[in-house]
Amino acid sequence: MKNVIIYTDGACRGNPGPGGWGAILLYGDKEKELFGGEPETTNNRMELMAAIVALETLNTPCQVVLTTDSKYVMDGITQWMANWKKRGWKTASKQPVKNVDLWQRLDAAVQRHDIDWQWVKGHSGHPGNERADALANRGIDEMKHKQGQAS
């Protein structure tokens, strides 16, 4: 199995508001940057998208270390998801899981890989996280630029 290091981040200007996600994938001496944006979204959706797209980009099963600054993604994947699935994607209080479309997509994406989930404090100077943050903001900027051209 290939060893891949992934850094992800999401950003939102207003919550909800225009948002972006960014991810960096490192494999040996290879590096891939991914980013995207949506005109109306939330920070949590963008954090999820960063992890989803990064994992979906991997063509073969990999040994992954995925670093996020999102407690929402970290707790969801390591603590909450198993019970959500047992309850038919409902919370402990029997409410539908928020962002269930993305959680289900992430659930599918993680199945192929052996993933070590790592949390890092955001905006604390961690180089991988800072780069992912810059890509997330680029995702917002490029999406807004395209919107400006379309109108």
UniProtKB/Swiss-Prot annotation:
Any GO MF annotation of the entry: nucleic acid binding
Q: Give one Pfam hit by family name.
A: RNase_H
Supply the EC number(s).
3.1.26.4
Specify whether Ligase is a keyword of the entry. no
Reactions this protein catalyses: Endonucleolytic cleavage to 5'-phosphomonoester
Binding residues for Mg(2+) 1: 9, 47, 69
Tell me where it resides: Cytoplasm
Q: Which UniProt keywords apply?
A: Cytoplasm, Endonuclease, Hydrolase, Magnesium, Metal-binding, Nuclease
Cofactor-binding details, from the entry: Binds 1 Mg(2+) ion per subunit. May bind a second metal ion at a regulatory site, or after substrate binding.
Q: Which domain of life is it from?
A: Bacteria
Q: How does it assemble?
A: Monomer.
**Function per UniProt:** Endonuclease that specifically degrades the RNA of RNA-DNA hybrids.
Which PANTHER family does this one have? RIBONUCLEASE H1
Annotated family:
Belongs to the RNase H family.
- Please state what the protein is called: Ribonuclease H
Q: Which organism is it from?
A: Alcanivorax borkumensis (strain ATCC 700651 / DSM 11573 / NCIMB 13689 / SK2)
